[in-house]
A protein has these predicted regions:
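Long C-terminal interaction/binding lobes of large macromolecular proteins
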Residues: 44, 57, 74, 86, ...
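Catalytic alpha/beta core of large soluble enzyme barrels
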Residues: 69-168, 185
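Short Gly/Pro-enriched turn/cap motifs at secondary-structure boundaries
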Residues: 24-27, 102-107, 303-306, 403
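A short acidic-Thr-Gly-centered motif at the start of a beta-strand
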Residues: 34-45, 116-118, 134, 294-297
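Residue patterns forming the tRNA-binding/recognition surfaces of aminoacyl-tRNA synthetases
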Residues: 1-47, 54, 70, 140-263, ...
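Short loop/turn motifs at secondary-structure junctions and domain boundaries
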Residues: 104-109, 238-239, 382-384
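Conserved active-site neighborhood of enzyme catalytic/cofactor-binding cores
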Residues: 113, 136-147, 153-167, 241-250, ...
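Conserved catalytic alpha/beta cores of large enzymes that bind or transform nucleotide phosphates
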Residues: 86-112, 160-170, 198-212, 216-217, ...
Length: 410
């Protein structure tokens, strides 16, 4: 996540627009404001929400917490306890992909509690819904059904009021009634605030600035940038990966394997069993070791690294296969011949499938930047040009894949 902004910079890169857009959406940079909503009748209880559309804040008619949000059990009324607890149990059986899928039916339940909109002091009901994820943003949202697709359908489903608070210029003389809407009014660039007290008539982007200023002056919020991107969880429960050089000691805790003992090598006699765990966990010769700190008994980490770790950098090492560990340049250990790297990199054109747009093609850009910051490369992008070669399709005109059963048996 530290490299998110730099990964959004495609300047001087000849990459397909579609891949650039996919990476931009994956990183998901959102500029907006984050502010607090106080819970009615709950002294000192509040929660934070983030919005990229502060100009629609007067249209908030409800707010939603993730089922896992820490406030849910505290603010839920006695009358709603059973239905809320049942909903939390049901949502816990769904994974994040299921919960956020566009095709997943949006469901939720009312907690019985209310929050106060700091811009107009109106009370809005607090719901929980599994399409809100606790680990993304604040784990809570302000819901503006008049100007958000998801909120609109949720409000119609549960008979929650809808307010129109921004319109397009051509709608100013005849502001739509919320009951006549077939969908939300989404246009941002030409939007003008209405039904918003003394903000009426304020156009975007001035509307963003004015509301953000008031929120800040009230002391309830501030400008903020959010990212959809999370840090990379690299551990995998598989045999054929790069070992993670960590040992666990009962006395000293978690310790890194000393540099002079690297690389940690995989055994060649592991036994594979249908346990769902890595064979390394049952290989005594690999598992048992000594603590580099105290010399006592210790165990190695048995998870290995994600395959994309290796494919993000090993092509640099391929340029100097006989380079030996310990060879140095300017008294610094270097894993490859820097002269060959300078002669041949960055790559002029990389040919790769678009299916890797948010995986390998993002990871190897990230790795190149990290290696440059470590002084191991003198450039920050791995390739100047990307060419997507397309897919081989089966007779059913779908991507040829084992999972689809449409491959040709050689």
């Amino acid at each position: 996540t530290k490299y998110a902004d730099e990964l959004l910079d495609f300047q001087n890169l000849d990459w397909p627009e579609r891949v650039r857009t996919m990476q931009e959406n994956w990183i998901g940079k959102s500029e907006g404001i984050e502010f607090s909503l106080k819970v009615s009748d709950q002294k000192n209880k509040s929660f934070r929400v983030f919005t990229t559309r502060p100009d629609t804040v007067f249209g908030m008619t409800f707010c939603v917490l993730a089922p896992e949000h820490e406030l849910v059990n505290i603010i839920t009324t006695n009358e709603q306890k059973n239905v809320v607890n049942d909903y939390i149990k049901a949502s816990s059986r769904k994974n994040e992909i299921e919960r956020t899928s566009e095709t997943h039916e949006k469901t939720g339940v009312f907690t019985g509690a209310y929050a106060i909109n700091p811009m107009n002091n109106e009370s809005v009901p607090i719901w929980i819904a599994d399409y809100v994820i606790a680990s993304y943003g604040t784990g809570a949202i302000m819901a503006v059904p008049g100007h958000d697709e998801r909120d609109f359908h949720f409000a119609r489903k549960y008979n929650i009021p809808i307010k129109v608070v921004v319109v397009n210029p051509e709608q100013l003389n005849s502001i739509p009634n919320s009951s006549d809407l077939n969908g939300p009014i989404l246009q941002k660039e030409t939007s003008i605030m209405v039904n918003s007290q003394n903000f009426d008539g304020t156009a975007w982007p001035e509307s963003f600035e004015r509301v953000a200023e008031i929120i800040s002056k009230k002391g309830v919020g501030e400008r903020k940038i959010n990212y959809r991107l999370h840090d990379w969880l690299i551990s995998r429960q598989r045999m054929w990966g790069t070992p993670i050089p960590i040992v666990y000691c009962g006395t000293c805790g978690m310790k890194p394997v000393p540099y002079e003992q690297l690389p940690v090598l995989l055994p060649d006699d592991a036994e594979f069993k249908p346990t769902g765990e890595s064979p390394l966990k049952f290989h005594e010769g690999f598992l048992k070791t000594t603590c580099p700190n105290c010399g006592g008994e210790a165990e190695r980490e048995t998870d290995t690294m994600d395959t994309f770790i290796c494919s993000s950098w090993y092509y640099y090492a391929y340029l100097s296969p006989y380079w030996k560990k310990g060879e140095t340049i300017a008294k610094k250990d270097i894993p490859w011949d820097m002269k060959k790297i300078k002669d041949l990199c960055p790559v002029d054109q990389y040919t790769g499938g678009i299916e890797h747009a948010t995986m390998h093609l993002l990871y190897f850009r990230f790795f190149t930047k990290v290696l440059a910051d470590l002084g191991l490369l003198d450039f920050r992008e791995p390739t100047k040009k990307l060419f997507n070669q397309g897919m081989i399709l089966g007779e059913d005109h779908e991507k040829m894949s084992k999972s689809r059963g449409n491959v040709i048996n050689p």
